[in-house]
Amino acid sequence: MILQIRDAGVKLILAIVLYGTTLDGTTNFSHSYPFCGPSIGLCLEDEVLVGVLADPFRDELYFAAKGNGAYMNDLHNTGTPQKLSVTSVDTFHKALFSSGFPHDKESQMFKNMLERFIRLEYESHSIRKTGSAALSLAYVAAGRIDGYVASGLHSWDMAGGILIVEEAGGKVTDFEGHPYMMSNREWLISNGTLHDTLVELLKID
């Protein structure tokens, strides 16, 4: 949807975009591995306004609206929503991360991600490769993991979870620490406390 606004005689054209996927984690699903689910994000240009994720296997619904916090409830949203908050872990050796890789194993992006994975594995408590970007973001927001490092992703993989992480107190950027854009293919998500050190650790010359 295109929104047109006139401000002081100047017409501004803003794009409201709905990014989503009916199933994030398709490879998991194809192997009957129960870590996947739908994801949707409503964006104004590159700013996410509303994000919703679901984990049907654990009866969990994650949602956030800009400026109103992030919450988790059951899938029917019948219980009392639990407000989400990222961890306060501030040292790598105590931190648990999730990671995601590009599908093309011959690409430079894959090779760079593999180098980052090795660095992070040495420095952190451990890393998980979950196979679902959306639920990895939900787990950062819920304080179950401390960060998510991934390459090769698309806007529809990320849009639903970005705001949920931010509203829970986390941070979302590219690998250089720059503010994210929906066109990004490489993403760095953390509890915020670890973020600057993560950026330095994962730099590739």
How does the language model describe each region?
Residues A142-G147, G170-K171:
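Alpha-to-beta junction loops
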Residues A138-A141, I162-E167:
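Hydrophobic residues within well-ordered alpha-helices
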Residues M1-L23, K171, P179, T193-L194, ...:
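N-terminal subdomain of lithium-sensitive/metallo-dependent phosphomonoesterases centered on the IMPase/IPPase/PAP
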Residues F101, S151-L153, E176-H178:
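Short secondary-structure boundary segments
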Residues G25-G37, F57:
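Substrate-binding/gating loop at the entrance of the active-site cleft, primarily
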Residues L12-I16, F92, A141-R144, M182-N184:
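A short, glycine/Asx- and small/polar-enriched loop/turn
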